[in-house]
Amino acid sequence: MAQCGGGDVSRHRKGHLDTVESLCQGLLDDVMLDDDKCRAMFGYLQEWQDLASMCYGSLGGEPPLAPEASNGSGSSGGGGSFRKRRPDDAKGESNSICKRQRGKQQQQQQPCHPDQMAAAVGKGRPERARPGAKKKAEVASPKDSPATSASTVTAGQKTDYIHVRARRGQATDSHSLAERVRRERISERMRYLQELVPGCNKVTGKAGMLDEIINYVQSLQKQVEFLSMKIAASNPVVNFNIVEDLFGRQLSQAACNPAALPAMALPMAQVEPSCLQMSPLQQMQTSAGSSGYGLEMVVSNQYSPPGGPMSVPAGASVEPCLNVNGAAGWDIGSHGLFSGFDAPFQSVQSDCLLDNLKMEM
């Protein structure tokens, strides 16, 4: 009886499973699913008994009981009992199903054009701005700018000046022609200087040329100074303007101090007393201070008529007046008159000559 009862239960379960499978098969046929999906669904229903009970409850049948596991021996039921599936097997089947679906989707998407694929990817994922791309774009833009600027210049008005690509610190468009002319003038003058200065042609470079020219000019200046000093020492020339200035100073000092006057005048040993006589009237004038400097002198009180011979006193001799140390009395300017300050005159004269030569150069 027990075996008959067990056979009835197993038959009842098998009938319910057959009905569920038939219903699910109809649904799957309507949805057009694969056999693998159906098997996976039945595997999940057997794994989770709650879902199986819900499905069986909705169909109006009793849920099947879980089969008892046997140690290596099959069940003694009249029919075949279902084997319990492990969750690992179910997961493996689901993974294989997902892989097959992805393979089919890729095969369906392969006929698409590559441009459409790129557009779809661009819409789906926004590209990130790379830091190197911006720098490359900035570097590429200046390279393209000269070509574009040149094309615009040629397309527009033709300029009269010559366009020169200027570097930093140089002239550009409108000033390029003037800059070129200025440089040509400088180079031409440097060539002239090279021809004038001996040994400058061997030097290369503007800096070396300028050094050679400066050294040559300095040597010329030293030679001119030496020659001018030599000429001044060999040929002294009195500058009368300087002499007048010195006389004016000496006379002004003599007016303030009459004792300093004989130092400027002729030496007393060279002057004959008989030639230079001062009248009593002049002595009174000098004592009274009415005369300017007391230099009024008379040769003799005797007056001779015009055209007649000049009378000379008996005791006086004319030779001492006309001859001073064997030289003419009129040559007194270079020998006796300036004997007190010959050295200052020579130094002043040499300085004046040097100044005049430098001004002429």
Swiss-Prot record:
Residues 184-220 are annotated as: Helix-loop-helix motif. It is found in: Nucleus. Transmembrane segments: none annotated. GO terms for molecular function: DNA-binding transcription factor activity; protein dimerization activity. Keywords: Gibberellin signaling pathway, Nucleus, Transcription, Transcription regulation. Gene3D superfamilies: Helix-loop-helix DNA-binding domain (4.10.280.10). Residues 170-220 form the bHLH domain. Residues 66-160 are annotated as: Disordered. It holds the Pfam family HLH. It comes from the Eukaryota. Residues 170-183 are annotated as: Basic motif. Plants expressing BCL2 in the lamina joint and the spikelet under the control of BUL1 promoter exhibit increased leaf angle and grain length. A motif (Nuclear localization signal) lies at residues 166-173. Together with BCL1, positive regulator of cell elongation at least partially through increased gibberellic acid (GA) biosynthesis. This is Basic helix-loop-helix protein 79. The lineage of its organism: Eukaryota, Viridiplantae, Streptophyta, Embryophyta, Tracheophyta. The gene is BCL2.
